[in-house]
Regions:
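Non-ligating segments of multi-cofactor redox enzymes
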Residues: 1-231, 235-239, 246-247, 253-283
Length: 283
Protein backbone atom coordinates (compact mmCIF):
# COMPACT_ATOMS: atom_id res chain seq x y z
CA UNK A 1 0.00 0.00 0.00
CA UNK A 2 1.39 3.39 -0.96
CA UNK A 3 2.20 6.03 1.64
CA UNK A 4 -0.19 8.93 2.00
CA UNK A 5 2.74 11.30 2.36
CA UNK A 6 3.40 13.55 -0.66
CA UNK A 7 5.75 11.99 -3.20
CA UNK A 8 8.96 13.65 -4.34
CA UNK A 9 7.32 14.41 -7.69
CA UNK A 10 4.37 16.06 -5.97
CA UNK A 11 6.63 18.18 -3.77
CA UNK A 12 8.82 19.23 -6.71
CA UNK A 13 5.76 20.19 -8.76
CA UNK A 14 4.40 22.32 -5.95
CA UNK A 15 7.75 24.05 -5.53
CA UNK A 16 7.95 24.75 -9.27
CA UNK A 17 4.40 26.14 -9.27
CA UNK A 18 5.19 28.32 -6.27
CA UNK A 19 8.42 29.55 -7.85
CA UNK A 20 6.75 30.68 -11.08
CA UNK A 21 3.84 32.28 -9.23
CA UNK A 22 6.26 34.15 -6.96
CA UNK A 23 8.26 35.35 -9.96
CA UNK A 24 5.14 36.75 -11.63
CA UNK A 25 3.90 38.40 -8.44
CA UNK A 26 7.29 39.99 -7.68
CA UNK A 27 7.48 41.28 -11.26
CA UNK A 28 3.97 42.70 -10.97
CA UNK A 29 4.77 44.36 -7.64
CA UNK A 30 7.97 45.94 -8.98
CA UNK A 31 6.13 47.21 -12.03
CA UNK A 32 3.31 48.57 -9.89
CA UNK A 33 5.72 50.39 -7.59
CA UNK A 34 8.18 51.68 -10.19
CA UNK A 35 6.55 51.24 -13.57
CA UNK A 36 8.38 50.83 -16.86
CA UNK A 37 10.41 53.93 -15.98
CA UNK A 38 12.24 51.70 -13.51
CA UNK A 39 13.01 49.22 -16.28
CA UNK A 40 10.49 46.62 -15.11
CA UNK A 41 8.13 45.21 -17.72
CA UNK A 42 4.52 44.49 -16.87
CA UNK A 43 3.22 40.95 -16.54
CA UNK A 44 1.60 41.44 -19.97
CA UNK A 45 5.05 40.95 -21.49
CA UNK A 46 5.37 37.58 -19.75
CA UNK A 47 2.12 36.06 -21.02
CA UNK A 48 2.53 33.41 -23.75
CA UNK A 49 -1.11 33.79 -24.79
CA UNK A 50 -0.34 37.38 -25.75
CA UNK A 51 2.04 35.96 -28.35
CA UNK A 52 -0.78 33.95 -29.90
CA UNK A 53 -3.10 36.97 -29.85
CA UNK A 54 -0.62 39.23 -31.63
CA UNK A 55 0.83 36.64 -34.02
CA UNK A 56 -1.63 37.27 -36.86
CA UNK A 57 -1.05 41.02 -36.90
CA UNK A 58 2.69 40.53 -36.66
CA UNK A 59 2.72 38.17 -39.65
CA UNK A 60 0.37 40.30 -41.77
CA UNK A 61 1.81 43.79 -41.25
CA UNK A 62 4.83 43.37 -39.00
CA UNK A 63 3.29 45.19 -36.04
CA UNK A 64 2.47 44.09 -32.53
CA UNK A 65 -0.89 44.59 -30.87
CA UNK A 66 -0.48 47.28 -28.17
CA UNK A 67 0.83 45.91 -24.85
CA UNK A 68 2.42 42.90 -26.53
CA UNK A 69 6.11 42.52 -27.28
CA UNK A 70 8.61 40.19 -28.88
CA UNK A 71 8.79 38.42 -25.52
CA UNK A 72 5.16 37.35 -25.89
CA UNK A 73 5.83 35.81 -29.29
CA UNK A 74 8.97 34.03 -28.08
CA UNK A 75 7.13 32.64 -25.05
CA UNK A 76 4.08 31.72 -27.11
CA UNK A 77 6.00 29.89 -29.83
CA UNK A 78 8.22 28.25 -27.23
CA UNK A 79 5.15 27.02 -25.38
CA UNK A 80 3.64 25.57 -28.55
CA UNK A 81 6.87 23.70 -29.30
CA UNK A 82 7.08 22.53 -25.69
CA UNK A 83 3.51 21.25 -25.85
CA UNK A 84 4.26 19.19 -28.95
CA UNK A 85 7.07 17.61 -26.93
CA UNK A 86 5.58 17.30 -23.43
CA UNK A 87 1.84 17.82 -23.79
CA UNK A 88 0.07 20.06 -21.30
CA UNK A 89 2.84 20.07 -18.69
CA UNK A 90 2.79 23.89 -18.72
CA UNK A 91 -0.69 23.80 -17.20
CA UNK A 92 0.26 21.34 -14.47
CA UNK A 93 3.70 22.65 -13.56
CA UNK A 94 4.14 26.30 -14.57
CA UNK A 95 0.89 28.23 -14.95
CA UNK A 96 0.37 30.37 -11.81
CA UNK A 97 -3.40 30.37 -12.22
CA UNK A 98 -3.41 26.58 -12.38
CA UNK A 99 -1.35 26.54 -9.19
CA UNK A 100 -3.86 28.86 -7.51
CA UNK A 101 -6.69 26.51 -8.40
CA UNK A 102 -4.72 23.56 -7.00
CA UNK A 103 -4.26 25.57 -3.80
CA UNK A 104 -8.01 26.14 -3.58
CA UNK A 105 -8.63 22.41 -4.00
CA UNK A 106 -6.12 21.64 -1.24
CA UNK A 107 -7.85 24.17 1.02
CA UNK A 108 -11.26 22.64 0.32
CA UNK A 109 -9.96 19.19 1.22
CA UNK A 110 -8.34 20.54 4.37
CA UNK A 111 -11.67 22.04 5.40
CA UNK A 112 -13.40 18.76 4.43
CA UNK A 113 -15.80 20.51 2.09
CA UNK A 114 -17.19 18.06 -0.50
CA UNK A 115 -16.27 18.51 -4.15
CA UNK A 116 -19.00 19.58 -6.54
CA UNK A 117 -18.97 16.74 -9.07
CA UNK A 118 -19.92 17.69 -12.60
CA UNK A 119 -21.82 14.87 -14.38
CA UNK A 120 -19.80 13.22 -17.15
CA UNK A 121 -22.08 14.38 -19.96
CA UNK A 122 -22.12 17.97 -18.70
CA UNK A 123 -18.34 17.83 -18.23
CA UNK A 124 -17.84 16.83 -21.87
CA UNK A 125 -20.17 19.56 -23.13
CA UNK A 126 -18.68 22.27 -20.91
CA UNK A 127 -15.20 21.24 -22.07
CA UNK A 128 -15.96 22.75 -25.48
CA UNK A 129 -16.29 26.13 -23.78
CA UNK A 130 -12.52 26.64 -24.00
CA UNK A 131 -12.63 26.45 -27.77
CA UNK A 132 -15.55 28.85 -28.01
CA UNK A 133 -13.74 31.32 -25.75
CA UNK A 134 -10.55 30.89 -27.80
CA UNK A 135 -12.35 31.49 -31.09
CA UNK A 136 -14.15 34.54 -29.72
CA UNK A 137 -10.96 36.07 -28.34
CA UNK A 138 -8.96 35.56 -31.53
CA UNK A 139 -11.77 36.98 -33.68
CA UNK A 140 -12.22 40.05 -31.46
CA UNK A 141 -8.46 40.62 -31.22
CA UNK A 142 -7.88 40.39 -34.97
CA UNK A 143 -10.92 42.62 -35.66
CA UNK A 144 -10.03 45.36 -33.18
CA UNK A 145 -6.20 45.09 -33.05
CA UNK A 146 -6.53 45.33 -29.26
CA UNK A 147 -5.98 42.94 -26.37
CA UNK A 148 -9.72 42.57 -26.02
CA UNK A 149 -9.50 39.72 -23.51
CA UNK A 150 -7.30 41.71 -21.12
CA UNK A 151 -10.38 43.47 -19.75
CA UNK A 152 -11.84 40.14 -18.61
CA UNK A 153 -8.87 37.81 -18.10
CA UNK A 154 -8.92 36.48 -14.50
CA UNK A 155 -5.24 35.49 -14.67
CA UNK A 156 -4.21 39.02 -15.62
CA UNK A 157 -6.59 40.57 -13.10
CA UNK A 158 -5.22 38.56 -10.20
CA UNK A 159 -1.52 38.22 -10.99
CA UNK A 160 -0.88 41.68 -12.44
CA UNK A 161 -1.91 43.05 -9.01
CA UNK A 162 -3.98 45.70 -10.78
CA UNK A 163 -6.53 45.37 -7.98
CA UNK A 164 -3.81 46.53 -5.60
CA UNK A 165 -2.14 49.32 -7.57
CA UNK A 166 -4.85 50.48 -9.97
CA UNK A 167 -8.15 49.51 -8.36
CA UNK A 168 -11.07 51.01 -10.25
CA UNK A 169 -14.40 49.27 -9.80
CA UNK A 170 -16.19 51.54 -12.26
CA UNK A 171 -14.09 50.45 -15.23
CA UNK A 172 -12.86 47.03 -14.13
CA UNK A 173 -15.91 45.49 -12.48
CA UNK A 174 -16.33 42.83 -15.22
CA UNK A 175 -12.79 41.55 -14.61
CA UNK A 176 -13.19 41.60 -10.83
CA UNK A 177 -16.56 39.85 -11.01
CA UNK A 178 -15.32 37.14 -13.36
CA UNK A 179 -12.17 36.59 -11.28
CA UNK A 180 -14.15 36.26 -8.06
CA UNK A 181 -16.61 33.87 -9.69
CA UNK A 182 -13.76 31.70 -11.01
CA UNK A 183 -12.05 31.63 -7.61
CA UNK A 184 -15.25 30.63 -5.81
CA UNK A 185 -16.12 28.08 -8.48
CA UNK A 186 -12.62 26.57 -8.44
CA UNK A 187 -12.93 26.02 -4.69
CA UNK A 188 -15.76 23.55 -5.34
CA UNK A 189 -14.83 22.28 -8.83
CA UNK A 190 -11.13 21.37 -9.29
CA UNK A 191 -9.45 23.34 -12.08
CA UNK A 192 -12.75 24.82 -13.23
CA UNK A 193 -11.11 27.52 -15.34
CA UNK A 194 -8.69 25.07 -16.96
CA UNK A 195 -11.37 22.52 -17.80
CA UNK A 196 -14.09 24.75 -19.20
CA UNK A 197 -12.93 28.28 -20.04
CA UNK A 198 -9.18 28.75 -20.44
CA UNK A 199 -8.38 29.75 -24.06
CA UNK A 200 -4.70 28.92 -23.68
CA UNK A 201 -5.62 25.54 -22.24
CA UNK A 202 -7.86 24.97 -25.24
CA UNK A 203 -4.98 25.75 -27.59
CA UNK A 204 -2.62 23.41 -25.78
CA UNK A 205 -5.17 20.60 -25.62
CA UNK A 206 -5.35 20.59 -29.41
CA UNK A 207 -1.57 20.34 -29.74
CA UNK A 208 -1.32 17.75 -26.96
CA UNK A 209 -3.00 15.24 -29.25
CA UNK A 210 0.26 15.00 -31.19
CA UNK A 211 2.65 15.39 -28.25
CA UNK A 212 5.76 13.21 -28.33
CA UNK A 213 5.52 12.21 -24.68
CA UNK A 214 2.27 11.20 -22.98
CA UNK A 215 0.99 9.02 -20.15
CA UNK A 216 0.24 5.44 -21.18
CA UNK A 217 -1.61 2.62 -19.44
CA UNK A 218 -0.54 -1.02 -19.55
CA UNK A 219 -3.88 -2.79 -19.93
CA UNK A 220 -2.37 -6.18 -19.04
CA UNK A 221 -1.51 -5.13 -15.48
CA UNK A 222 -4.30 -2.61 -14.79
CA UNK A 223 -6.64 -3.84 -12.03
CA UNK A 224 -9.35 -1.29 -12.88
CA UNK A 225 -9.37 0.21 -9.38
CA UNK A 226 -9.99 3.65 -10.90
CA UNK A 227 -7.77 5.39 -8.35
CA UNK A 228 -6.15 7.22 -11.25
CA UNK A 229 -9.54 8.67 -12.24
CA UNK A 230 -10.09 10.00 -8.73
CA UNK A 231 -6.58 11.46 -8.55
CA UNK A 232 -6.77 13.37 -11.84
CA UNK A 233 -7.41 17.09 -11.11
CA UNK A 234 -9.09 17.60 -14.49
CA UNK A 235 -11.16 14.41 -14.13
CA UNK A 236 -9.83 12.47 -17.10
CA UNK A 237 -11.05 8.86 -17.17
CA UNK A 238 -7.51 7.51 -17.23
CA UNK A 239 -8.71 3.95 -16.58
CA UNK A 240 -10.53 3.93 -19.93
CA UNK A 241 -7.53 4.95 -22.02
CA UNK A 242 -4.34 3.42 -23.31
CA UNK A 243 -2.88 6.85 -24.01
CA UNK A 244 -3.77 10.08 -22.20
CA UNK A 245 -3.33 13.19 -24.34
CA UNK A 246 -5.75 16.05 -25.03
CA UNK A 247 -6.79 17.33 -21.59
CA UNK A 248 -3.84 16.00 -19.58
CA UNK A 249 -1.93 18.66 -17.63
CA UNK A 250 1.06 16.40 -17.00
CA UNK A 251 0.83 16.54 -13.21
CA UNK A 252 1.64 12.80 -12.95
CA UNK A 253 -0.78 12.33 -10.05
CA UNK A 254 -2.35 9.31 -11.74
CA UNK A 255 1.05 7.59 -11.92
CA UNK A 256 1.77 8.43 -8.29
CA UNK A 257 -1.60 7.05 -7.18
CA UNK A 258 -1.60 3.80 -9.17
CA UNK A 259 -1.11 0.83 -6.79
CA UNK A 260 0.41 -1.43 -9.49
CA UNK A 261 3.99 -0.45 -10.39
CA UNK A 262 4.60 0.60 -14.00
CA UNK A 263 0.97 0.21 -15.06
CA UNK A 264 0.83 3.93 -15.76
CA UNK A 265 4.01 5.39 -17.19
CA UNK A 266 5.34 8.16 -19.42
CA UNK A 267 5.67 6.76 -22.93
CA UNK A 268 5.96 8.15 -26.45
CA UNK A 269 3.67 8.66 -29.40
CA UNK A 270 5.68 6.21 -31.52
CA UNK A 271 4.92 3.21 -29.33
CA UNK A 272 2.70 0.65 -30.99
CA UNK A 273 -0.38 -0.78 -29.32
CA UNK A 274 1.63 -3.91 -28.51
CA UNK A 275 4.38 -1.86 -26.91
CA UNK A 276 1.82 -0.02 -24.82
CA UNK A 277 0.71 -3.34 -23.36
CA UNK A 278 4.00 -5.23 -23.13
CA UNK A 279 6.03 -2.09 -22.33
CA UNK A 280 8.83 -3.26 -24.59
CA UNK A 281 10.91 -0.40 -25.86
CA UNK A 282 9.53 2.13 -23.37
CA UNK A 283 11.75 5.18 -23.08
Amino acid sequence: MKSKNPSHTHIIRRLVQFGFALFILVTAARHGLGGEEAGVASTDALCPFGGLETLWRLVVNGRYIPKTHASNVVLGVGLLVGTVLAGGAFCGWICPFGGLQDLLTALRRRLRVPELRVPDKADRILGYGRYLVLAGILYATVSTAKLWFASFDPYRTIFSLSWLFEFNWATSWPAYTISLAIIVGSFFVPRLWCRYLCPLGGTLSLLSRISLFRIRRDTSTCIDCKKCDKACPVRIKVSDKRSVTADCIGCLQCIETCPVPDTLYVGTIVESAHAAESKEGVA
